[in-house]
């Protein structure tokens, strides 16, 4: 009988707590929710309600439960409960909105990976990814905004078009308030903490960080020890033998050119142009030119362009990093939210998923570009010419080498691109 009484008391306490809050697991996260209307009642009425529910519990336990009831709203404001309640409410609102529309880089593989990964966690929220070159989607966002049409919620891509377009137009929403999950919000989970591309540190979140091998050579035409510094590119032997992805257009050719402008200066680039550079915009043709020995050294192409030639056993290899270094990048791993997002809650859910461990595993796996998350393996990307910054750099060195922040774009890349037009047009 005594055991039965203890069991009843235990069940009674659980019943009251469950009636007031309710416990549920949403997307692998335990959340608490109210299951009674959020109405104000007197303490007396609340006590009577509790007394009826508890039906004869001892005074100490009864008044403990009164305290629990009275202070429940305060408990909901504690850090742990607050984010759980916010996450639950956001998911419910996102499900009512039904979908989130995301502008992404031009990759069918990424589109499939994002849509499948997100749907697995949130089957009641449709994630529509629209792949295109960053500038194309951003131009569409601009045109639709002028016409009062707001289709996109989130944009993921390189920073140039964002910094020169969306940011000054005032179309972006601060992103930090949208971070809800502790694993996303806590800086300790990210190499370098939270890194932003915009000067205000609010709008453009850089979730990738890596070095890209964009210097390649033909092993039959050049020995790697012959190029230990960028100054060695000015040797007479290499005149007419260096090709470069046209630095007048956005891409890794322009990024490398800008890095040279930064570390070697304008006079150096003038001398480099006098080396009779082989200019090209067709990456396949440039890769063939290096593979067949027409060019001895290539600037601006990545592993993926050379991949079929490497598989065929042709004599091309990445050049060891010159003593001045190579540029660091966040690549296409930058995310922003639009101020006019038609599905704000679904956007929050997507951003938190994207920046979670799972989301970053999906993005890095599809793009081969290393994340800054410390709990995601990125060592494997090195074999594809993408070297994770967290594996080889300090955050301080990354900031010295990076090429995608607002400051670098305005003070380095824009003037460097202008010089490219001046010298090469």
Language model features by range: what are they?
Residues 1-53:
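N-terminal secretory signal peptides that target proteins for export/translocation
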Residues 52, 56-70:
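Bacterial N-terminal signal peptides
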Residues 83, 390-425:
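Conserved C-terminal helix/tail region of periplasmic/extracytoplasmic solute-binding proteins
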Residues 84-95, 99-126:
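Short, polar/charged alpha-helical segment
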Residues 101-116, 128-142, 150-287, 291:
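Extracytoplasmic ligand-binding site segments that recognize negatively charged/polar headgroups
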Residues 162-165, 297-317:
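A ligand-binding cleft/hinge motif common to bilobed small-molecule-binding domains
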Residues 269-273, 278-280, 313-341:
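Periplasmic-binding protein-like
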Residues 333-399:
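Mature extracytoplasmic/periplasmic domains
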